[in-house]
Amino acid sequence: LELNGSFTQGGLLFGKTNSKNKVFFNNKKIFINDSGDFILALGRDEKLENLILIEGLKKKKTHKIKISKRKYKIQRIDGLPKNKVTPDQEELKRIKKESKKISISKNKFLNKTFYKSGFIWPVKGIVTGKYGNQRILNGQHRRPHYGLDIAAASGTKVISPSDAEVVLIMEDTFFN
């Protein structure tokens, strides 16, 4: 097992094993490509000690990994439209429908290693929201932020941060 990356809460790990093996992390089977490459996304509040199970053709092996704790900031944003903080029932239905499409696209496995070409910034701008930060919107505590926001003028061209294959296009979504 080879494992590299950011061993911190919210980090990303890049692994390699025999392509015939099965990899499990947090009791979930991890997709492995034909070359044995895989990615582990560590959760915002990932346990500080974790196990990776490698199941080979003849034996199983457990690998212990240590994860460092990450400190998150609190982000207060006021002046947002009320429906963006507390959507009504019709908007909640829309959000649920859009979220389902996004979730399905995120779980689509492509037997490719686009990430190996590296990453660049998709747009120049000010970072206005970071992964993991706790959000207080119009004075109301909301779930942590699970993305990276970059402010740019409306109509600014945004490029892919890495080599990629588009698996979902959605226009005029509720939040994005």
Predicted regions and their residues:
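Extracellular ectodomain segments of secreted/surface proteins
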Residues: L1-F14
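Short proline/glycine-enriched turn/loop motifs at strand-loop junctions of beta-rich domains
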Residues: G15-K22
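Structural motif
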Residues: F25-N27, I54
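Short beta-strand segments within Ig-like beta-sandwich modules, predominantly Fibronectin type-III
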Residues: K28-D34
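Short strand-edge motifs at loop-to-beta-strand transitions and within beta-strands
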Residues: G36-L40, L148
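Surface-exposed, short loops/turns at beta-strand junctions within beta-sandwich domains
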Residues: A41-L48
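Short, exposed coil/turn segments at beta-strand boundaries within extracellular/luminal domains
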Residues: G56-K61
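Surface-exposed, glycine-biased beta-strand/turn segments
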Residues: K64-N176
